[in-house]
């Protein structure tokens, strides 16, 4: 860090502005975009993944609708600790049709594609006590690379977020995690989550 620079207070920020930041995301091209267009870049990025990128460089063809189902499930479970079994149940609950993502192997395959495309950033669990791993949660917390992608997958707007503060909270947590991860990468550090299983 540069200790010669003065720390600046950014002042207060309204919850409405945070909702807009969640939809806008960290896309440099989105900084000066009109407010009614801030969700277009994340949505276009998801569309590009589904229509072009997910099958590029691979002989195996993946189904666009299944990938969309998975992305929407990951978005619904943003900043949550969920396994593949829970993702499958989530898809069965929210999606219609017979051709669902119904096996863990298929979910793993599609998650590998998203990982290869740097679209997911699973946050590892912190564990200091190496001799007693049962005392803390070990599962990673699920994140798309930018919370604006989760918002785009779910068709969220600032107004919709403000009407659903539970979802707003998970997206805000993802925003904080994204920014802290960027700082930690610069410092060659790691960002973990912690959940104590002892009750």
Regions found by a protein language model. Give the residues of each.
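Accessible peptide chain termini
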Residues: 1-2, 96
């Amino acid at each position: 860090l540069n200790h010669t620079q003065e720390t600046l207070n950014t002042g207060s920020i309204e919850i409405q502005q945070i909702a807009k930041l969640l939809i806008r995301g960290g896309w440099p091209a989105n900084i000066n975009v009109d407010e009614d267009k801030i969700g277009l870049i994340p949505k276009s990025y998801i569309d590009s993944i589904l229509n072009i990128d997910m099958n590029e460089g691979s002989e195996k063809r993946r189904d666009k609708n299944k990938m969309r189902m998975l992305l929407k499930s990951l978005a619904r479970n943003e900043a949550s600790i969920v396994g593949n079994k829970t993702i499958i149940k989530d898809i069965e609950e929210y999606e219609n049709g017979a051709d669902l993502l119904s096996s863990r192997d298929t979910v793993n395959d599609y998650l590998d594609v998203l990982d290869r495309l740097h679209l997911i950033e699973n946050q590892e669990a912190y564990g200091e006590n190496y001799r007693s791993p049962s005392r803390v949660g070990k599962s990673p917390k699920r994140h798309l690379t930018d919370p604006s992608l989760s918002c785009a997958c779910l068709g969220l707007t600032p107004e919709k977020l403000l009407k659903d503060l539970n979802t707003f909270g998970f997206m805000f947590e993802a925003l904080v995690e994204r920014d802290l991860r960027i700082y930690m990468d610069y410092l060659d550090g790691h960002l973990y989550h912690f959940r104590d299983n002892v009750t």
